[in-house]
Swiss-Prot record:
The keyword Transferase applies. Keywords: Acyltransferase, Flavonoid biosynthesis, Transferase. It catalyses: (E)-4-coumaroyl-CoA + 3 malonyl-CoA + 3 H(+) = 2',4,4',6'-tetrahydroxychalcone + 3 CO2 + 4 CoA. The keyword Hydrolase does not apply. One of its GO terms (molecular function) is naringenin-chalcone synthase activity. Its EC number is 2.3.1.74. Belongs to the thiolase-like superfamily. Chalcone/stilbene synthases family. This is Chalcone synthase 1. The primary product of this enzyme is 4,2',4',6'-tetrahydroxychalcone (also termed naringenin-chalcone or chalcone) which can under specific conditions spontaneously isomerize into naringenin. It comes from Daucus carota (Wild carrot).
Length: 389
């Protein structure tokens, strides 16, 4: 008869959790950031606010975003005029859209990850689904399980309304699941649609306008598992460690509240400063055990909350401009997609590394960091180890 310890050991994987495949997806509707101020003030019937429009135009110009993708088209907004008002009761109509569209967009990203993985979807043992919107029962995890045709016994984890840091959270959870369950293959999906947050402008709430200038829609998916099957599964990044912390003196810096008008966001101006002055501590705690203290010697995947956050982190740590190349590229091409962003950046980095002939998926470097920043202020710090492409 085996002992409890022998049984527990047999249930666990031998190697570290590894990202085995990545997939991304966006809605087909692409928005040109340079023309967005005109479109936004026209569609929200706010042309009578020229000064506010010019403020918003400057926000769009300073965002360092070229394009975003949005499920909300002009036709859909005309069908739902309450979305275009600043504080009109509209939650039911928004909810009807997101409970269906969030899982659908997640399905597109998941199918691309599964295709790259090369294994039958019947081998998926766990599902983690993350989204900021569309709370329902059964949840988006249930809907995605049905849409993909996963086994009914798949073990599901649903994470609602975590916000922009959650791209790190899902990897932390996937790491624990993969390493503590032998042969586990975890499908992770982050799907974000701004239907729940879109609204017209208001002179007294400029923080709401900031969100209208930054946020876009997208879904990212990864397959995570330990002990890759040689010749079939190709590891991309090893997840070495993961930590979460609440920054000191940051209460109320980023808040989101679900109301009859949808999800409202409130931001303090000093969010970039709060993150940049605390980020070194998270880095030291994560990399001191590895003997690493040169932040230019690692590759970087940072949630692109906005250009000001990236600029101040870069300055605080004396990072070379190329360190945040992949992060800035995703911000430029997609905007801030909340939890999905870091998965897009993982994808961008491994593709760019292969294209540029680097020896690893992490721009030729062995070690790297993935940061998620969001409400709380909460910071997720994930240490990654790259592999040869």
């Amino acid at each position: 008869m085996v002992t409890v310890n022998e049984f527990r050991k047999a249930q666990r994987a031998e190697g570290p959790a590894t990202v085995l495949a990545i997939g991304t997806a966006t809605p087909p509707n692409c928005v040109d950031q340079s023309a967005y101020a005109d479109y936004y003030f026209r569609i929200t019937n706010s042309e009578d606010k020229p000064e506010l429009k010019e403020k918003f135009r400057r926000m769009c110009e300073k965002s360092m975003i070229n394009t975003r993708y949005m499920h909300l088209t002009e036709d859909l907004l005309k069908q739902n005029p309450s979305f275009c008002e600043y504080m009109a009761s509209s939650l039911d109509a928004r909810q009807d859209i997101v409970v269906n569209e969030v899982p659908k967009l997640g399905k597109e990203a998941a199918l691309r990850a599964i295709k790259e993985w090369g294994q039958p979807k019947s081998k998926i043992t766990h599902l983690i689904f993350c989204t900021t919107s569309g709370v329902d029962m059964p949840g988006a995890d249930f809907r995605l399980t049905k849409l993909l045709g996963l086994r009914p016994s798949v073990k599901r984890f649903m994470m609602y309304q975590q916000g922009c840091f959650a791209g790190g959270t899902v990897l932390r959870l996937a790491k624990d699941l993969a390493e503590n369950n032998k042969n586990a293959r975890v499908l992770v999906v982050c799907s974000e649609i701004t239907v729940i947050t879109f609204r017209g402008p208001n002179d007294t709430h400029l923080d709401s306008l900031v969100g209208q200038a930054l946020f876009g829609d997208g879904a990212g998916a990864v397959i995570v598992g330990s002990d890759p099957v040689i010749g079939i599964e190709k590891p991309l990044f090893e997840i070495v460690s993961a930590a979460q912390t609440i920054l000191p003196d940051s209460d109320g810096a980023i808040d989101g509240h679900l109301r009859e008008v949808g999800l409202t966001f409130h931001l303090l101006k000093d969010v970039p400063g709060l993150i940049s002055k605390n980020i070194r501590k998270s880095l030291v705690e994560a990399f001191k055990p590895l003997g690493i203290s040169d932040w230019n010697s690692i590759f970087w995947i940072a949630h692109p909350g906005g250009p000001a956050i990236l600029d101040q982190v870069e300055t605080e740590l004396s990072l070379k401009p190329e360190k945040l190349k992949s992060t800035r590229q995703v911000l430029r091409d997609y905007g801030n997609m909340s939890s999905a962003c870091v998965l897009f950046i993982l994808d961008e980095m491994r593709k760019a590394s292969a294209k540029d002939g680097h020896r690893t998926t992490g721009e030729g470097l062995d070690w790297g960091v993935l940061f998620g920043f969001g409400p709380g202020l909460t910071v997720e710090t994930v240490v990654l180890h790259s592999v040869p492409p």
